[in-house]
């Protein structure tokens, strides 16, 4: 009685396994890959808080709450500095020519037309693995004192808050949990041997106040496939400056800002101190999150998921109140981010027939 049942089960498993194997599509990496990072930064302050916000990267998929344009020349990876201005970083990879020294990016008339000159750096670390799209997060050092964690917008501190961690007695697991933050940051523009980038010492022109990415772009160079052409729509353009307003509201801090038509979501976080060795963290999330991993580029899927989880503020939100009593010590810093829409283009598109191998000529990520 048992033998036939086993035979049937094994036959079924074999059929499922063969079907799955038959449907597995061969996917090869693109012959050329480009990364384009876009950001707009501005300094922000709060009543009683020391200095402008923006010490850490507050990049968005289409720009941040931002200020005016820069002047003179700019350096590569300004999209990661938080310095006031409007920035674009570009990196190009050619698998046909791993030692590509320079390339050209044709750009629309509104963006330093007619072209950007990309130049590969010298004496830099080896390029990351082709399949390594994740940017590792650094482990935080063990702090001293206590941590007070608050979350949520509103005039008063909610019941059950703050969450307090005493670093003198907390376990490593408790500390890790306290600093836990959602994060889905992937690789973007970067510096590596054989990968030309812009800006660079040869071409470091700053963007004008009215610069725009919208329109046709094209890459060319030794080993770059012909026809590496694509359009960037308005959703991926530099965001306009956010006009952040703040006011005292009975001890709470009321924040409000203008709408951002291309924003996918918003997030606000603050860090402050109370006396010696006491740290205060607050975020606009409806659930506990230290927020440190969220102040960076995130994927569209992650942003949408965190909207459902009420971690991020909706794109129609234009205000948030920091509860009374959260920041009452020696000063604090506020950081805010508007997430735009990440654009991923691949040519040719993936074949619908799984039996046909997918061999892209080029791919580009704009965020």
Model-derived segments and spans:
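Short, aromatic- and glycine-rich surface loops/edge beta-strands on solvent-exposed regions
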Residues: 203-228, 329-343
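Hydrophilic extracytoplasmic domains
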Residues: 256, 261-367
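Bacterial N-terminal signal peptides that target proteins for export
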Residues: 1-9
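Structural beta-strand segments of beta-rich domains
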Residues: 251-255
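Proline/serine/threonine-rich low-complexity linkers at boundaries of modular beta-sandwich domains
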Residues: 225-239
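N-terminal signal peptide c-region/cleavage motif recognized by signal peptidases
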Residues: 17-21
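Solvent-exposed N-terminal domain segments of exported/luminal and surface proteins
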Residues: 29-201
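Boundary of Sec targeting at the N-terminus
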Residues: 23-25
């Amino acid at each position: 009685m048992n033998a036939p049942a086993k035979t049937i089960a094994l036959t079924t498993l074999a059929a499922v396994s063969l079907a799955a194997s038959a449907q597995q599509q061969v996917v090869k990496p693109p012959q050329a890959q480009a990364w384009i990072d876009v950001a707009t930064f501005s300094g922000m302050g709060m009543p009683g808080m020391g200095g402008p916000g923006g010490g850490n990267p507050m990049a968005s998929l289409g720009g941040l709450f931002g200020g005016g344009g820069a002047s003179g020349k700019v350096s590569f990876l300004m999209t990661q500095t938080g310095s006031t201005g409007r920035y674009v970083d570009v990196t190009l990879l050619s698998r046909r020519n791993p030692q590509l020294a320079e390339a050209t990016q044709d750009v629309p008339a509104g963006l330093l037309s007619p072209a950007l000159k990309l130049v590969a750096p010298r004496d830099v670390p080896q390029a990351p693995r082709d399949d390594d799209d994740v940017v590792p997060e650094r482990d935080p050092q063990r702090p001293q004192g206590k941590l007070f964690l608050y979350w949520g917008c509103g005039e008063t501190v909610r019941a059950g808050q703050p969450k307090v961690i005493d670093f003198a007695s907390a376990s490593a697991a408790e500390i890790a949990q306290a600093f836990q933050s959602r994060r889905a940051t992937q690789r973007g523009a970067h510096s590596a041997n054989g990968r030309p980038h812009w800006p660079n010492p040869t071409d470091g022109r700053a963007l004008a106040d009215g610069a725009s990415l919208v329109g046709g772009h094209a890459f060319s160079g030794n080993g770059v496939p012909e026809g590496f052409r694509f359009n960037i729509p308005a959703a991926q353009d530099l965001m306009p400056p956010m006009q952040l307003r703040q006011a005292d509201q009975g001890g709470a801090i009321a924040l409000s800002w203008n709408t951002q038509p291309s924003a996918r979501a918003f997030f606000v976080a603050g860090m402050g101190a109370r006396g010696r060795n006491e740290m205060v963290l607050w975020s606009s999330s409806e659930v506990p999150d230290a927020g440190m991993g969220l102040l960076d580029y995130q994927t569209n899927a992650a942003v949408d998921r965190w909207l459902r989880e009420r971690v991020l503020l909706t794109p129609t939100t234009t205000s948030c109140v920091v509860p009374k009593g959260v920041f009452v010590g020696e000063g604090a810093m506020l950081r805010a981010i508007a997430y735009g829409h990440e654009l991923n283009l691949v040519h040719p598109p993936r074949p619908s027939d799984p039996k046909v191998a997918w061999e892209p000529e080029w791919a580009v990520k704009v965020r």
